[in-house]
Every structure is written in structure tokens, then in C-alpha cells.
Amino acid sequence: MNESYQPTLIEQLAQEYWEENETFEVKEDLSREKFYCLSMLPYPSGDLHMGHVRNYTIGDVIARYQIHKGRNVLQPMGWDAFGLPAENAAIQRELPPAEWTRKNIKKMRKQLKQLGFAYDWSREITTCDSTYYRWEQWLFLQLYKKGLAYKKNAIVNWDPVDQTVLANEQIVDGRGWRSGAVVERREISQWFLKITDYSEELLKDLDELKEWPEQVITMQRNWIGQSQGVIINFNLEKGPDKLQVYTTRPDTLMGVTYLAIAPEHPLAKERAKKSKKIAAFLKKCKQTRVAEADIATQEKEGIDSGLFAVHPLSKEKLPIWIANFVLMEYASGVVMAVPAHDERDHEFALKYDLPLKPVIEPADGHDWDYNQAAYTNPGKLINSGSFNDIDSKTAFNVIADYLKNNGAGSRQTHYRLRDWGISRQRYWGTPIPIIYCKTCGTVPVPENQLPVLLPEDIIPTGHGSPLKETASFYKTRCPVCNKPATRETDTMDTFVESSWYYARYSCPDQDKVMLDDRAKYWTPVDQYIGGIEHAVMHLLYARFMHKILRDLGLLNSNEPFIRLLTQGMVLKDGAKMSKSKGNVVTPQSLIKKYGADTVRLFIIFAAPPEQDLEWSDSGVEGAYRFLKKLWGFSYRIKDALLAINQQKERSNYQWEAPEHRQTRQQIHECLQQANIDMERLQFNTVVSAVMKILNILIKLTTDNDAEAHLIREGTGILLRLLSPITPHISHHLWQSLGFGGDILDAPWPRPDPKALQTTELELIVQINGKLRGRIQVPTEASKEIIESTALNQENVQRHLADKKIKKVIVVPKKLINILV
């Protein structure tokens, strides 16, 4: 053991030891309790950033802690390798995305290993490998057979220059981020997965997720968006057709003054053929983003269609407007407008001088100026004919029943959740295994012809999908009639890859089936770690896919992740680290200067996992100083501990002196609190406990036999508490100080109940409520002994002097108050 702390050397030796001994490679073992710890897999950008390091350090602390507890721990790592970022990087560098991606993976794998994470690298997966996406294609075929994968027209953001669909974040001021072209709303044919078939179960099973953050549960509940409402039929004034409206407010039905339909509604398109003004308006609407949030905040605009509908109860004529705020994807693309009781309808009505008809007044009868603002709270019905004077809550059921009984409507449970559009007009993704034949139509690729390989030698240009230009890919023969046919050139949304990867880690070597029985052993994941930005999309899709895999008989649980931790961001100068802000700190530079253990220790100590972490250079220096202090202390006690650790009776040492028992009690109290905090995932306070223990031990001397044994016990506790957080130095010191074997094989320390037993109490002594002294008494001391000890305390006697004592109050285990 060197006298000076040399992190580069000891970390290299520890990592070589773990690799040579395959320390973290695990097998299924039914005799042991399993623990599956997983951090969200990264996109291989080529460089780890501090957000990665924090995420993976938190996961590694949890995994190593569970190893110490004797569990069979799986902690794998892989790469979310498909997607737009790799394609864009390849365009800029004029090289194939496959080459760029694999080069980055190699670089990032090395960086992860330098941090000493306890990953089972034998299970590594890369989503752009055909061995992985082959089974994704197989899964798509199963969904297609069950009617859960289907194709339909959908509205997208379309870049007319690059000839591709854009995500909302790729649009800047209404223009494509690369081409600068004005983005259009276009209806194109796309593939969808029928997640809506699982809406009710996805909502209901949120109640099972007792160890998920409440914020994530709420976000998913709102995204699924269950509502109870009524479908109401509005007949067109002319002809047999009708418009169906879904509403959660049938109590306001008598206040409808117009209907609004989406620009993509068939009726709007039909009217555009006969009106240039309407056609121009629809064209303008095409230049609006398709995101619901964008549509909600944009200026409300519309145009009169010239058509009328008939109110189902009053039989009044209602004008039908085409409005840019109505979503075709929501319900039927038709809204019944009640401007007196809906803020959006009110804003639109005032702009276009449409009538307001109040039908609910405040329950307390106070006047409301409906011209100034919509009244949206509960109240009493007015101007509603036979429904007058009914409270609005009761009116929901009364009017719903009336509509049903008169064939004008029906109750319906509605979900905000839409089916999952997985088509991407991109190259770098999983090919959708579908063939189009002029004779046979849409034909799924036979399973024995999987995988449909993505050509990896293509250099994309950014103008449309290169797969459409690659004849060797899209030209094929129909598997049914053997005539010339074409492949689907859309690729899958990369969220598909990340929706089932956690299960594939259980059997990445399996080439006969998608998942084998090992998946049932390891799933569900016991602890999942990742950012809250994935609360809705990724986590919801993974829950959906888990239920699909369960229904296919491949898994036997309802949910993919038992416990979820959403770590906070890493900030510097109050802002998230980013290259554009110039506030990035690279992990590699810190590892080179201080070592991986220092980086890990700072990351863990600086903030609780779920809170944002403010970067501090002085905090990193402090973590480094602590490890040097630990190393120096260990070097000083090395010879004494090696000698004690060779003694057979070392574990049965009895401490007699009160000061030694008190010191031991302090150590075990720190251990007790640290264990509570480990279970609560409050690792920063575990580090605080470790620092307290070291400060206690440093004051002891190895020249005293009792203290030397205290140092041995305390150091053994300290190193095991640190082992999940700073594994390299803990591994090295455990062996150098003669504790024997691999520290990971050492059981997690538990406090000794005897050490925690208090033999003496410190009580405060008051005179007329003012603090005048402190006394030490045996834990079981009688009231008489406590009174006597208090009255004989030197400072108390001085304050009493010749005063007459009226009463002595003893509050057990707390204080004595002498009244004079």
C-alpha cells in the first residue's frame, strides 16, 4: 500500500480485478432473491456528460448496495442507437450513421468502464443491431395479426423541401430547422399501434405503482385523460347527415350557439371545393403545428362554413364554423360551442360576433357579466326550458338520460390518449416488416424472412428518406404471389426500441425467440432510474409494451418497473449544463485529475438523488480531500489492522471502559442512520455518516488495544458503507487492511443492538425554567438519585445559594426543573 493516494492506479487495478473475475456477470438463481437495477439506456452521442454520470452513479450505488445484501443483482447497459440525432450527425460528417454510431459506442463504453460501474457487459445490447431489431419486427407482426398495428391517414408537420415529417421541436418560427421552408400540416398514411385498447388498464394499474413519484403518476393519469361524457347527435339542416359531438358538459347543452369543426373534417374539405375563402383558410391552417399545446395557445381563427345544424332539443338552427383550435384527432373533430360557459368558445364568439346564451347562473344568485367572461363554475340552470332550476351536477345525468331516451345521444367514457403513431419517414431506424403488392395488397413479411435488414452503407442527405431511393432495399417480391412488390420505407419510432429493451437484457443471446423464461425470472425491473422528462412518452409506452408481452405469454407481470427514481438535473451557475451555455464540465477531465471515486462521491454527496444538483468545483475538491484523508488514516493504521485481522477472536472483543462503549455507540448510531437513509435512497446523508465515523476513528490510537479494535470494527463498517459509492478505494483498502476476500462478498453492516443501548443519560437542569447545568445519570436512575445529582451539581448549587426550593419537577429522560 503506497503512502500517497493514487486514484488512477488503484482504480485501474480494481477495474482489472472485476473484469478478470467476471464479478458482475450474473446467472439466474431461483434459490436467491433477485434484484434488477436499471438506468435508462443512453443515446451514443460519443461523450458522457454529467447528467449521464449522475444517473448511472445513482443506479450503481443501488446495485452495489443490493449485492452487499446478498441479492442476485442484474445491472446491464446498452445503447439506444437508432434515431434522428445519429442521422443528422452523419449528414453533417458525410458518413453512414452506422459507422458514426459504433465509433461513439466504443468511446462511451470505455468512459463508463472508467467510472467503475458494476455492469454485466456480457448482456450489452445495441438497438441498431439486427439481432435486436429482428425481434422488434417479429413483435410488430404479432401486433399486426391481432389488429393492434394498423395504417391510417394522420396529420403531421411536413417539410416540403426536405420531404420529411418533422417533430414539433424541429420547427423554428414555423419553418423547418434545416431547410428553412414553411412547414405544412399534411395528411399522410402512417402506421399506428393501438395503445387505446389498453387505456383503461394503463389508467387502472397506476394504482399498483406505489413506489413511483406522485408527479409521474399524475402526469400519466392526465395524459391518458379519462373523462365521463355524452355523445350528442346534431342533424344537419339539409340532408340525412349528422355531426356527433363528445362533451363532458351536457348540462350546458341549451347554451350551444354554434358548432366548430376541425379544418381536416370531411365537411370542411367538401365546403372548400365550393368556396375559395374556405380553401384559403384551410391552406393557412396547414401551416400550423400539430402539437396540441401549440394549437391551444395560438390565436383562435375560423370561417363560417355556410352550413347549419339543428339543436337536438330546441331545434334551433346553429351555424357550423371551421376553427383552427378544433383537433380532428380528439373525439370526432367537432365541438359544440357554449360561449357563455367556456373561455375558448367565449373568445371565439366575441371575435366573430356570435351570440352568447347563458344557461347556468351562480348558485348563490349573484349577478355575472357573461359578456366580460364565461362562467365556468357549477351553478343552477336557467334558459333551459324544463331543465330550469336544476343544479348543474344533477343536470348532467338528467340531460344525458333525456338524450338517450330520445335517441339523440348516449353516455361514453372517453380517453384523451391517442393511438401511438410509429411511422418515421427516416432512414436510421428499424424497418417496418410490411410489403406492398399490387395483387395481394398489404402483406406482412413472413417470420422466417426476418430480419428485414437496414442497409448500413447509406450516407443520408437530409432530403427525404434514402430508403425510397435504394432499390436494393425497397424492391422485393411478394411472399404470397411472388410478383414484384415494394417494401415499406418508413422506419419505426425509436421509442419502440426503448419500450422493451429492459426485457431483452435478460436473454440477449437468445436467437430462437424474442424472450425466454429468463425474462420471467428477471422482470419486472426492481429499480428504474431516469429523468422525469420521460414521464409520459417512454414510461407510458414501456408500460403498454409490457402488457402486450404479457398477453403474448412472454412475461408474467403487469408492470415493467416496480420502483422509479427520477433524478434531478446537474446545474452550473443555476442553469442546466449545455455546450451552448458554455457551462459544461466534462467527466473525463475530472477523472483524469481526481479519479472516478472523487467524481462519484461528489455526485452522491452534493444533493439527494431526486433534487437538482448545483455543480461546485470546491465540492469536488472537498470530496478529493476526504478520500485522501481516508487513505492517510488507513496507511497509519495498516500494520495494527493487519495484525488484528489475523486474530481468530477479533470479532468477539468486549469493550469495558465507558468512553470506549460511548465511542462504539456513536459509530453504531451513525451506521443505524446510514442504513435507514440507504433504504430511503438518501445517499448524501449516508456520506455524512461516513464522514462522522472517520472523524471519530481518527481520534483513536492503535497503541491502545481497545481503541485498535474499535478502529478495526469502525473501519470495516466505514468501508462497506462507502463501497457502493466509491468502490475502487473501498475495494483496495479492504484488501490492504487485511479484512480478507472481496469487499463485495462482505455482508452489509448492521448496528449491534448492544452497542446502541445507552447506559447513561445526559439531562439538563433548569431553575425556574432557565438552563443552569447538565448532569450524567444511569439510564435506570430513580427519581431520588436524579434529584440528588441535580441539586449537587456545582453550578446549580451556586444559583440556588440560600433560596428556598418549592418543588423539583423531573421530566423522564429529558430535564429537571427546580422551582424556587
Curated annotation (Swiss-Prot):
One of its GO terms (biological process) is leucyl-tRNA aminoacylation. It is found in: Cytoplasm. The keyword Cytoplasm applies. One of its GO terms (molecular function) is ATP binding. Pfam families: Anticodon_1 (PF08264), tRNA-synt_1 (PF00133), tRNA-synt_1_2 (PF13603), tRNA-synt_1g (PF09334). The keyword Signal does not apply. ATP binds at residue 579. Keywords: Aminoacyl-tRNA synthetase, ATP-binding, Cytoplasm, Ligase, Nucleotide-binding, Protein biosynthesis. A motif ('HIGH' region) lies at residues 42-52. A motif ('KMSKS' region) lies at residues 576-580. SUPFAM superfamilies: Anticodon-binding domain of a subclass of class I aminoacyl-tRNA synthetases (SSF47323), Nucleotidylyl transferase (SSF52374), ValRS/IleRS/LeuRS editing domain (SSF50677). Its EC number is 6.1.1.4. It catalyses: tRNA(Leu) + L-leucine + ATP = L-leucyl-tRNA(Leu) + AMP + diphosphate. Belongs to the class-I aminoacyl-tRNA synthetase family. NCBIfam families: leuS_bact (TIGR00396). This is Leucine--tRNA ligase. It comes from Coxiella burnetii (strain CbuK_Q154).
